[in-house]
Every structure is written in structure tokens, then in C-alpha cells.
Amino acid sequence: MSGKLVIGNWKMNTRGDSARQLAAALLADGQTNREGVGIAAPAVYLAALAEQLKGGKIALSSQDVSRFAADGAFTGEVSAAMLADVGCRYALVGHSERRQYFREDNAALLAKMRNAIAAGVTPVLCVGETLAQREAGDYLNVVREQLAILSDIADGEYVVAYEPVWAIGTGKVASLEQIAEIHAFIKNWCLQNAGGSAKIRVLYGGSVKAENAEAILATENVDGALVGGASLDADSFRVICQAAGKMI
């Protein structure tokens, strides 16, 4: 495991044509078409993008994975085995938007983590506090509770992404001091408590843009970035990936 990891989370954006055009632009650029770069696309476009990305180096990620492992009567779900079958290398788990809108709890997220690992897909566990929790000084406890499921992972590789909820899509960015503090906390907690991977990557997410990426990625214990809106613009995403590439 070397170099920074940058994953672009497209969220519920793009259509078929625009997804293909964006992927084509990323494939055509050496800064984005390389190891250590991934895109988390909407589920309906994963199969088409997997075909398009063949021969390139960009990793494909899903934005979620089912908590149900076996095939069966789970309408609307996409299993980890299906994601692996289509070519996904990563799967986001527990993004704050899913925690908020779908009330995902630790039990469901642990099942998702285990299913992804069993299928050979690397889960990216998203953690982070709200503004109220930050201002109340409770943010470390919140993140600790979200990380707790890693104690029940017996084996396998995974990634952690710290995304302060108050910085997602708001234009607000945590200070470099805040980022350094929480990333050190996450790594120390994982070293003492987490199972599975002995060396865990911790990404930062939350209004990562072309203009702030280099400073964020240079911060101690930041192993990469989970990029939202900026990943929908090929030029902006290129600058972020270029900044990450300098730090290999």
C-alpha cells in the first residue's frame, strides 16, 4: 500500500452520456488514469463504466452495498457479490447522507463491511460528526462510536474516510489542525482496537477542491481524499489527483 488514494463520489449525479463523457476525460489524462484513483458512480452505470474502464487504471467503486449477503428476495438491493462481479474494487459504506436519510446503524454497516470484504471488495467506512456535535466538543466520541464496528472485523482490508458532516457540500472545510487531530485519533484508535488490516488508509472528505487539495493531502496522517462535487468536473478532479500524485 503506497501513495495517496483519491476516490471521486459522483453521488446521484450524471446520466448515461455524461457519465461516459466524464469517464472518457479521466481515462485520457495521465493524472487521473493511474493507480490510486477511483470513481464511485451511481449503481445503474457501474456495468457500463466497468466496460469503459477496462484497460485503464482507474478503480471502480460503488456508493453502497447491501447488508444482505445471500441472493434472494431483497428487492432493490445490490449485493457485494454483484459488485465484485461487475468489477468494483471499492464500496462506500456509511456515508453521512445514507446515515441521515436511510437511518443506517452500526449493525447494518458492520454487515455491509463484512459482506464487501468476503466478496473481495474493499469497503470505505465513512465517519464524521455534525456541526452541533463538533461545537459541543463531542466529536471524538461520535467518531469513536462509528469506528467501533471495526473491532468486529476479523480479517480483510478496508479504508476509513473522515468526512465532517458540516463540511460536505457546504463549502466549509475543516482546518488543517482539525484534520490532523482527527486523522491521528482515527489511526491511533484503529491501531489499538480495529481488526483486519494492519495498516489502514484514512481519507479526508468534505469540500475537497482543486484549490485546497494539496494542503489537505500534505497534512500528516491524511492518506488521500474522498471527493464529492469537484469529482464531477474533469479539470478540477485532475488537479486534485495531480496533487495526490506528487506525494507518492
UniProtKB/Swiss-Prot annotation:
Superkingdom of the organism of origin:
Bacteria
Which InterPro entries does this chain map to? Aldolase_TIM, TIM_sf, TrioseP_Isoase_bac/euk, Triosephosphate_isomerase, Triosephosphate_isomerase_AS
Question: Which GO terms fall under molecular function for this chain's record?
Answer: triose-phosphate isomerase activity
What biological process terms from GO does the record include? gluconeogenesis; glyceraldehyde-3-phosphate biosynthetic process; glycerol catabolic process; glycolytic process
Which EC numbers characterise this protein's activity in its record? 5.3.1.1
Q: What are the catalytic residues?
A: H95 (electrophile), E163 (proton acceptor)
Pathway annotation = Carbohydrate biosynthesis; gluconeogenesis; Carbohydrate degradation; glycolysis; D-glyceraldehyde 3-phosphate from glycerone phosphate: step 1/1
Binding of substrate: at which residues?
A: N9, W10, K11, G169, S207, G228, G229
Q: Where in the cell is it found?
A: Cytoplasm
Which Gene3D superfamilies does its entry note? Aldolase class I
Oligomeric state and partners?
A: Homodimer.
Q: What is this protein called?
A: Triosephosphate isomerase
- What organism does the record attribute this protein to? Chromobacterium violaceum (strain ATCC 12472 / DSM 30191 / JCM 1249 / CCUG 213 / NBRC 12614 / NCIMB 9131 / NCTC 9757 / MK)
